[in-house]
Amino acid sequence: DKLCTVKKSMLDKMFPKLGETEPEIRFEGFTDPWEQRKLGGLFFESNERSSSMEILSVSVAKGIYPASESDRDTNPGASLANYKVVHKGDVVYNSMRMWQGAVGSSDYDGIVSPAYVVARPAIELDSTCFGYLLKRPEMLYKYLCDSQGNSKDTQTLKYNRFADIEVTMPANLEEQRVISACLGRVDTLITLHQRKLELLRNIKKSLLDRMFV
C-alpha cells in the first residue's frame, strides 16, 4: 500500500496538474517546455484484423495482459473473425470503461475484442510514458466528460472524441523514456511486494491447516 501511495505521489508530481504546463518535479538535464497536443495528432485508430494471434485483455488494475492469465472464462468457442490486432507499443482502451482507467500501453503482440479501441502511435514517442499519462485522474475526468451515454454504465468514449482530447506532454523523447523507466521500476517493486505477500499468505494458510486438523 505504501508503494502504491508513493507511485500516486510520483504521478501527481511528474506530470502537470490540470491547467498547468509543467510538472512539479523534473529529471536533471531536461529544461525543454512541455507542449499541448491533441491525442489525434499522436495516435491513429487501427482497425487491422486477425484471428490467429494471442488474445489480450484490458483491465483497470492490470492494463493490457494475455487473456490466458485471467481467471475469467474467455469463451473459447466465440468467433475471433473481427478481433483487432495489437502490436507492442499500441495504446488500447475499453471504450465503455475508459473513464474508469481501462487503458494501457501494450507490451504484447496479439488481438483484442472489437469492443476495444486500438490507438497506434503516429509519431515517434514512448507509449509506456503515455500509458501512465492516460491513467491520471485528470485524464479520467476528461474521458467521462467526452463519453456518450445515458448513464455511467453505458458511457462510451469513441475514438473521434478520444482524438480531440488535449494532453500536456514532454516534447523531448528522452524525457518521456526516463519518466516511464522510473515509474516502471516502481511498478516492478509493487509486483514483487505483492508476490511476497501472496507467498506469506499461502504459507500461513498451510501452517494453519496443519495445526488444526
Where are the regions a protein language model picked out?
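Amphipathic alpha-helical segments with low aromatic content
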Residues: 1-35, 165, 174-213
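IQ-motif-like calmodulin-binding regions
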Residues: 40-43, 87, 174
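Non-catalytic DNA-recognition/assembly elements of restriction-modification systems
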Residues: 26-50
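Short, solvent-exposed loop/turn positions at domain surfaces
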Residues: 74-80, 151, 173, 185
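DNA target-recognition patches
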Residues: 43-77
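A short beta-sheet element
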Residues: 69-72, 81-146, 158
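Short beta-strand/turn micro-motifs at beta-sheet edges
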Residues: 13, 104, 151-155
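A short glycine-rich beta-alpha junction/loop motif
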Residues: 110-117, 150-174
